């Protein structure tokens, strides 16, 4: 198992290239199961979750070829079977995304209940209910979802009680081969969903209401789609994290290959804290703040402040003057990084879903342990400003969603080593 050894308080300067968005790539990879045509996907990030999804598709019988480290050519023309087994699914919650496409195209599938970050309840019930609304019969037996629709899926209204990104994606993919019209009400509005819509539209699916909370899908009257090649959008969470590298170290950094509109909630908050930003069409440059003010954040669904940036801003709050308040409204149990930040000297108090951070605090290097994907990046951020040396353990969490984060910060001047645990 690897860990990162980080020397803190090293001056940083330079430019960072942002990778493709993991959270866009995963549903798009799953959606290739709907196609009987070869598809090329570009700008895939080299992260563990993407490799796991590629392996799952290969296990189902898809033909895969990596044309370069970030481009995958694949064909799901003839699959061996429609069973997503536990050993392939257990490490990644996004594997539930194969449910909709497998069911829609092959009328029956067996999908293991998924794994992934342990950050509270992420019920698959919403996915199952959506499939049932389209006419599927669902049984859960021995840890597997057994879904079948012998006569195929039929368009219907799907109302999500709670906004669900992966639930919306699964419903979209299933509806694309359902007979007639499906309406998804209370749909998630993330940019990653807009890109999935564009991908499905390239295969002939008619979708109205993209970027809104109500999607109207007219399914294609065929047994499969003819999906076209696609390039994955930049990762807005990696972009936000790299801006926080500049913010927490109070450095001048330029973040390239981004879509600034996708991270407006993040840039608005950085400006409020005191950072001058130069926002261009596909880059943002952050400059040192004269004074970093405390702030308040409440996580919300897109376009609100993303829950996936909450941990990074908690690390940043330790360097801001005054009392910052972070309220987490989307997941319970998502403050596990707080106790690890406290090991570095952070002054944080927790009350249910609200964290209060008093700053500014001088952090001191220590051994800390990553508990989930975004928490791991928060610990890296804190270690960059801590006095002395920190070691961040269990970075397999980090590798699930960040492509070579240590290489990217080292290119800015940081001193980060990836080492093996003894």
UniProtKB/Swiss-Prot annotation:
Instruction: Indicate what this protein is called per its UniProt record.
Output: UDP-N-acetylglucosamine 1-carboxyvinyltransferase
**2-(S-cysteinyl)pyruvic acid O-phosphothioketal found at:** 117
Keyword annotations from UniProtKB, A to Z = Cell cycle, Cell division, Cell shape, Cell wall biogenesis/degradation, Cytoplasm, Peptidoglycan synthesis, Pyruvate, Transferase
Location within or outside the cell:
Cytoplasm
Q: Which InterPro entries match?
A: Enolpyruvate_Tfrase_dom (IPR001986), Enolpyruvate_Tfrase_sf (IPR036968), MurA_subfamily (IPR050068), RNA3'P_cycl/enolpyr_Trfase_a/b (IPR013792), UDP_GlcNAc_COvinyl_MurA (IPR005750)
List the active-site residues. Answer: 117 (proton donor)
According to its UniProt entry, the function of this protein is described as: Cell wall formation. Adds enolpyruvyl to UDP-N-acetylglucosamine.
Task: Output the NCBIfam families linked to this UniProt entry.
Answer: murA, PRK09369.1
User: Species lineage, top-down?
Assistant: Bacteria, Pseudomonadati, Campylobacterota, Epsilonproteobacteria, Campylobacterales
Q: Which gene encodes it?
A: murA
Q: What class of enzyme is it?
A: transferase
